[in-house]
Amino acid sequence: MSMFCFQCQETAKGTGCILSGVCGKTPEVANMQDLLLFVVRGIAVYNQALRKDGRSSARADKFIFDALFTTITNANFDKHSIIEKIKKGLELKKDLSNQVTIEHAPDECTWYGDETEFEEKAQTVGVLRTSDEDIRSLKELVHYGIKGMAAYVEHAYNLGYENPEIFAFMQYALAELTREDITVDELITLTLATGNHGVQAMAQLDTANTSHYGNPEISEVNIGVRNNPGILVSGHDLKDIEELLQQTEGTGIDIYTHSEMLPAHYYPQLKKYKHLAGNYGNAWWKQKEEFESFNGPILFTTNCIVPPRPNATYKDRIYTTGATGLEGATYIPERKDGKQKDFSVIIEHARRCQPPVAIESGKIVGGFAHAQVIALADKVVEAVKSGAIRKFFVMAGCDGRMKSRSYYTEFAEKLPADTVILTAGCAKYRYNKLPLGDINGIPRVLDAGQCNDSYSLAIIAMKLQEVFGLKDINDLPIVYNIAWYEQKAVIVLLALLALGVKKIHLGPTLPAFLSPNVKQVLIDNFGIGGISTADEDIAKFLA
């Protein structure tokens, strides 16, 4: 059985995974994800038509962003759960089709098949359905941006925030991707619009997070362990960890964060829980080793899952929820009737486990989202004016397995002492434990939070632009050297472009889904570039 996927940075040979996914995705899972996306596009066409006369379906809105999130890299490896989503999607599409007529409807709207036909149909609806290389490249750029946006939309939705304008745009974009006559120019316009709506989605999530949990503040986070049983929470969904903290309070079970959940420690309304014990381990890709020694159950609230080895001792300790899935793992169902998720099964499991084994000790510091940095604005501005801070380096983004990512550690180590790193996302793990010191009390690594908190870095940049009276954001002493891995990084990139940021450097490699011509458009219009060596790049960026 064959597949084709090139949505992540680690795609095989830098061109595409065809036998199995580097991520661990089987061809069966990859093809079912393609079919799910095909069904989603059809639902979007119908719901967009219904929206024009005020009859759009809220059920369709939610199904679309949840299904998109399911197909993000490392989110869902459970073929059966994806098949169930396809079946539900087909039922939903049928329901919508009974309410509106679409003239010249695309195949995405008209196809209905049972499970015996899924595999055959999936072979025809994936990335390679588009023969023109540039059209395909731009379609997938938009597709991946919309996937990343869907993740941020779902997190905000879980906290009670939704924006009909964002739903409408996502579905308009998905409907446009069904067009066989769409042009390069139309797709470029759609790409830029995706970036603009990405800014809105990140702003909405920032509002949702801060209104519920307070503004992130400077916080020390323990990276050691205590002597109690623990539950390790990975992913990005703050609502999930909040409910788990509430349900474990007073039980003697500690809660630890992993990878992108680290910033939970920065929010006042989460850090107040005394049993939020610390952060265990490093970036997502090290989990095969680190989960062995944690001893307790692990909860994946979102990506990034790495399928465990067959002989892994922690296989029966994995729990998934939300859009995530892994065959053999226990799934925590969604909230019903306004009630919390029921985490009792994972809590009972934790009671039977030994405490985690320490793999590190000490503390790390974070919490430098926009409100906290703006509160320090006078100090930062003075440091820039005095020359104590020569330049800021935005090193937000994702971490990954490739050995070439050691570049980011070397880059951080070799940066001069009068520079400051602004970061968000799991890229931080390449340097957030290095002894890089501070500048007049300002840490040289300012961690804003999760990947979506790249929005904070943009807000900080715009505030500095205002303070220094600059007309162009690109005149600031800021260099963008961003590591990417999956589709949320794509929407962050498109959002930065929408805000006018130019000369962004992406690494460790440029996306395989960018055709030579599309890549050239990004270079010519936005100054997008790659990376070389740490020494060469530092010399170039400081010149």
UniProtKB/Swiss-Prot annotation:
Binding site for [4Fe-4S] cluster: 5, 8, 17, 23
Cofactor field: [4Fe-4S] cluster; hybrid [4Fe-2O-2S] cluster
GO BP: response to hydrogen peroxide
InterPro entries for the chain: HCP/CODH (IPR004137), Hydroxylam_reduct (IPR010048), Prismane-like_a/b-sand (IPR016099), Prismane-like_sf (IPR011254), Prismane_a-bundle (IPR016100)
Keyword Metal-binding found: yes
Keyword tags: 4Fe-4S, Cytoplasm, Iron, Iron-sulfur, Metal-binding, Oxidoreductase
Pfam families, A to Z: Prismane
GO MF, one annotated term: peroxidase activity
Protein family (similarity comment): Belongs to the HCP family.
Protein name, as recorded: Hydroxylamine reductase
Organism: Bacteroides fragilis (strain YCH46)
UniProt gene name: hcp
